[in-house]
Amino acid sequence: MALPEFSMRQLLEAGVHYGHQTARWNPKMAEFIYGDRNGIHIVDLTQTVPMLDQALKVVRDTVAKGGRILFVGTKRQAQKPIAEAAEKCAQHYMNHRWLGGTLTNWKTVSQSIQRLKQLDEVLATGAEGLTKKERLNMEREQQKLQASLGGIREMGGTPDLLFIIDVGKEDLAIAEAQKLGIPVVAVVDTNNSPKGVDYVIPGNDDAARAIALYCDLVSRAALDGMSAQMGAAGIDLGALDVAPEEETLEA
């Protein structure tokens, strides 16, 4: 596998260049704006292309070193593509409301994950002894925890990189990542500030096609990193293919 390729045409067709209404702009994004058309800011894709490419390299390299990536997108149109992209590359996601302390208070979050796993087990195997009301309460608790934590239940610790759609909506996630020194890759639209984002992808963060394109590219970059990691492991294992000869004891 190789780093996923994309073209300027693909970005245009997905509407990546369409920003927000000029009245809603954030001056901190001025350097990434090409101009405006009919009251809408147009993102300078000649900058987006190399910056997206750099972001994909960071994703690939993080996974190649055995790192964990957390995909974050809680707005309605991002929820499904974020979850699908993370699952496709065996990474982790948060696509409902960001839970305060997900990163900075991982110990408490991991206790909630343990509770979710416990509920799964009880409801799958040993629910016979429960009353109808007890079972119903457990199922409700399970559904609530699954919606909040299902995408990070196998993360096993804080991630090594965040990939975010819509930095305005996910400002809490960025603040927590900054506090812990976790790098952030994010799509930043013309109405938001790139502050706190280590690898900015200037572009539309609302159009379904644009979101699907970002998610697909990041997922494929992670898969490329996984392939590189497995290849490296294969080389190490290959050196151990020949079993050491056993010394025979003389009678």
Curated annotation (Swiss-Prot):
Pfam families given in the database record: Ribosomal_S2
Listed InterPro entries: Ribosomal_uS2, Ribosomal_uS2_bac/mit/plastid, Ribosomal_uS2_CS, Ribosomal_uS2_flav_dom_sf
GO biological process: translation
Keywords: Ribonucleoprotein, Ribosomal protein
MF (Gene Ontology): structural constituent of ribosome
One cellular-component annotation, GO: cytosolic small ribosomal subunit
Family: Belongs to the universal ribosomal protein uS2 family.
Listed name of the protein: Small ribosomal subunit protein uS2
The organism of origin for this protein: Cereibacter sphaeroides (strain ATCC 17029 / ATH 2.4.9) (Rhodobacter sphaeroides)
